[in-house]
Protein backbone atom coordinates (compact mmCIF):
# COMPACT_ATOMS: atom_id res chain seq x y z
CA UNK A 1 0.00 0.00 0.00
CA UNK A 2 1.36 3.44 -0.95
CA UNK A 3 0.98 6.20 1.60
CA UNK A 4 0.59 9.86 0.69
CA UNK A 5 2.89 12.31 2.44
CA UNK A 6 1.08 14.69 4.74
CA UNK A 7 0.30 18.17 3.49
CA UNK A 8 -0.72 20.61 6.21
CA UNK A 9 -2.02 24.06 5.33
CA UNK A 10 -2.96 26.72 7.88
CA UNK A 11 -5.92 29.09 7.37
CA UNK A 12 -7.14 31.79 9.78
CA UNK A 13 -10.64 33.03 10.45
CA UNK A 14 -12.12 34.89 13.43
CA UNK A 15 -9.30 34.02 15.85
CA UNK A 16 -9.22 30.34 14.89
CA UNK A 17 -6.33 28.77 13.02
CA UNK A 18 -7.53 25.82 10.96
CA UNK A 19 -4.91 23.27 9.99
CA UNK A 20 -6.15 21.44 6.92
CA UNK A 21 -4.55 17.99 6.84
CA UNK A 22 -4.28 15.98 3.62
CA UNK A 23 -2.66 12.56 3.21
CA UNK A 24 -1.27 10.21 5.86
CA UNK A 25 -0.26 11.01 9.42
CA UNK A 26 2.67 8.73 10.18
CA UNK A 27 6.33 9.10 11.15
CA UNK A 28 7.07 11.18 8.07
CA UNK A 29 4.42 13.78 9.01
CA UNK A 30 6.28 15.36 11.94
CA UNK A 31 7.85 18.21 9.98
CA UNK A 32 4.68 19.23 8.15
CA UNK A 33 2.51 18.98 11.26
CA UNK A 34 4.99 20.89 13.44
CA UNK A 35 5.46 23.64 10.85
CA UNK A 36 1.70 24.05 10.42
CA UNK A 37 1.22 24.34 14.18
CA UNK A 38 3.99 26.96 14.26
CA UNK A 39 1.93 29.04 11.83
CA UNK A 40 -0.96 29.14 14.34
CA UNK A 41 0.94 31.54 16.64
CA UNK A 42 -1.36 34.27 17.92
CA UNK A 43 -4.60 32.40 17.21
CA UNK A 44 -7.12 31.97 20.04
CA UNK A 45 -7.88 28.36 19.11
CA UNK A 46 -6.80 25.62 16.73
CA UNK A 47 -9.02 23.46 14.52
CA UNK A 48 -7.49 20.28 13.11
CA UNK A 49 -9.32 19.38 9.89
CA UNK A 50 -8.94 15.64 9.21
CA UNK A 51 -11.40 15.60 6.29
CA UNK A 52 -8.73 14.62 3.73
CA UNK A 53 -6.67 12.30 5.96
CA UNK A 54 -6.55 8.73 4.70
CA UNK A 55 -4.44 7.00 7.34
CA UNK A 56 -3.12 7.58 10.87
CA UNK A 57 -0.75 5.11 12.52
CA UNK A 58 0.49 4.95 16.12
CA UNK A 59 3.38 7.30 15.38
CA UNK A 60 0.87 9.71 13.87
CA UNK A 61 -1.20 9.52 17.05
CA UNK A 62 1.97 10.42 19.00
CA UNK A 63 2.51 13.44 16.72
CA UNK A 64 -1.06 14.59 17.39
CA UNK A 65 -0.42 14.21 21.13
CA UNK A 66 2.60 16.47 20.66
CA UNK A 67 0.44 19.12 18.98
CA UNK A 68 -2.08 18.88 21.83
CA UNK A 69 0.75 19.35 24.35
CA UNK A 70 2.02 22.44 22.52
CA UNK A 71 -1.50 23.89 22.35
CA UNK A 72 -2.03 23.22 26.04
CA UNK A 73 1.27 24.98 26.86
CA UNK A 74 0.05 27.89 24.71
CA UNK A 75 -3.34 27.84 26.55
CA UNK A 76 -5.23 27.32 23.29
CA UNK A 77 -8.16 24.94 22.91
CA UNK A 78 -8.06 22.42 20.07
CA UNK A 79 -10.99 21.01 18.12
CA UNK A 80 -11.04 18.37 15.39
CA UNK A 81 -13.42 17.80 12.52
CA UNK A 82 -13.66 15.52 9.53
CA UNK A 83 -12.74 12.33 11.39
CA UNK A 84 -14.07 9.10 9.96
CA UNK A 85 -16.08 6.91 12.32
CA UNK A 86 -13.04 4.61 12.62
CA UNK A 87 -10.69 7.41 13.71
CA UNK A 88 -13.35 8.93 15.95
CA UNK A 89 -13.38 5.59 17.79
CA UNK A 90 -9.55 5.48 17.87
CA UNK A 91 -9.49 8.99 19.36
CA UNK A 92 -11.92 7.82 22.06
CA UNK A 93 -9.95 4.62 22.82
CA UNK A 94 -6.65 6.52 23.03
CA UNK A 95 -8.38 9.29 25.02
CA UNK A 96 -7.28 11.97 22.57
CA UNK A 97 -10.92 13.07 22.63
CA UNK A 98 -10.45 13.99 26.30
CA UNK A 99 -8.05 16.76 25.25
CA UNK A 100 -9.84 18.21 22.24
CA UNK A 101 -13.38 18.85 21.11
CA UNK A 102 -14.47 16.43 18.39
CA UNK A 103 -16.92 18.20 16.10
CA UNK A 104 -19.62 16.35 14.22
CA UNK A 105 -19.70 17.15 10.53
CA UNK A 106 -22.91 19.14 11.07
CA UNK A 107 -21.00 21.44 13.44
CA UNK A 108 -18.37 22.26 10.84
CA UNK A 109 -18.86 25.59 9.10
CA UNK A 110 -19.97 25.40 5.46
CA UNK A 111 -17.19 25.65 2.85
CA UNK A 112 -16.93 27.21 -0.58
CA UNK A 113 -15.56 25.46 -3.70
CA UNK A 114 -11.93 25.98 -2.56
CA UNK A 115 -12.67 24.39 0.81
CA UNK A 116 -12.59 27.68 2.69
CA UNK A 117 -15.20 28.48 5.35
CA UNK A 118 -18.00 30.65 3.97
Language-model features and meaning:
Residues 1-55, 66-118:
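STAS-like cytosolic regulatory interaction modules
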Amino acid sequence: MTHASLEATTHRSDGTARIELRGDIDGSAGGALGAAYGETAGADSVLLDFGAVDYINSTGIALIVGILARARADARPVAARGLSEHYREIFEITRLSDFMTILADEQSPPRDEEGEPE
